[in-house]
A protein has these predicted regions:
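Beta-rich, blade/repeat-based domains predominating
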Residues: 1-17, 24, 38-43, 56-74, ...
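A short loop-to-beta-strand structural motif that recurs across blades of beta-propeller domains
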Residues: 43-45, 95-97, 139-141, 179
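Blade-level signature of beta-propeller repeat domains, shared across WD40, Kelch, NHL, RCC1
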Residues: 161-190
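Short coil turn/linker residues within repeat-based beta-strand modules
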Residues: 49-51, 103, 146-148, 187
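Short loop/turn segments immediately following beta-strands, especially the blade-tip
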Residues: 98-106, 185-190
Length: 190
């Protein structure tokens, strides 16, 4: 069957590929081409080392960004279900969930890790000590490995994603509505 609209991807050190596949890329022509889902839902998939595609999670409203912890024992996945165009429905999901990754690369749901306000989480990255740098509508929010909001990088427009780069991985690149921003940090990303 045809995938919906693969959104975000991460590769684990064992070669497995993990990605989110929400419906919103096919709901209108705005982000893709409007069409009917052949899968009938929103999923998180893993491509195993034999190139087989497997569903690893099927209970997200709108699965979005994802990233592993530095030791790859945990996988974080954003749910941006509260987002409807430029509107937010706060009763819908706007959080990041945390999963334990088992020895066989299956997921054990540990529940909501952190709620993102204002806006919804989209893409995010992790630094070398496990802090999450997540997009929100007005900034990059920095979340500790314990799920606490420990900082914010203000951006003058809506933020969609971020990643670490540069030769030392201490530059955080941030995509926003109309520009690409970068900021040097004292810590490196993974």
């Amino acid at each position: 069957k045809k995938l919906n609209s693969p959104n975000d991807v991460v590769v684990k050190s064992d070669g497995t590929i993990w990605f989110t596949d929400p419906l919103y890329g096919i709901m209108t022509n705005e982000e893709g081409f409007k069409s009917k889902s052949e899968l009938g839902g929103n999923y998180v998939f893993r491509v195993n080392t034999k190139n087989q595609v497997e569903i690893v999670c099927n209970d997200f409203d709108k699965p979005n960004g994802l990233a592993f912890s530095p030791d790859e024992n945990f996988l974080y996945i954003a749910d941006s279900g509260a987002s409807f165009g430029e509107k937010i429905h706060p009763e819908r999901p706007h959080h990041i969930r945390k999963f334990k990754v088992t020895r066989n690369n299956y997921l054990e749901d540990l529940g909501v890790f952190t709620v993102i306000n204002p806006g919804v989480p989209d893409g995010f990255s992790v630094d070398s000590i496990g802090n999450i740098y997540t997009s929100s509508w007005d900034s990059i929010q920095i979340i500790s490995p314990l799920g606490e909001n420990i900082g914010k990088i203000e951006i003058p427009e809506k933020v969609s994603n971020c990643c670490f780069g540069g030769s030392d991985k201490k530059t955080l690149y941030i995509t926003a509505s109309s520009r690409l921003y970068s900021i040097r940090l004292k810590i490196n990303g993974i």
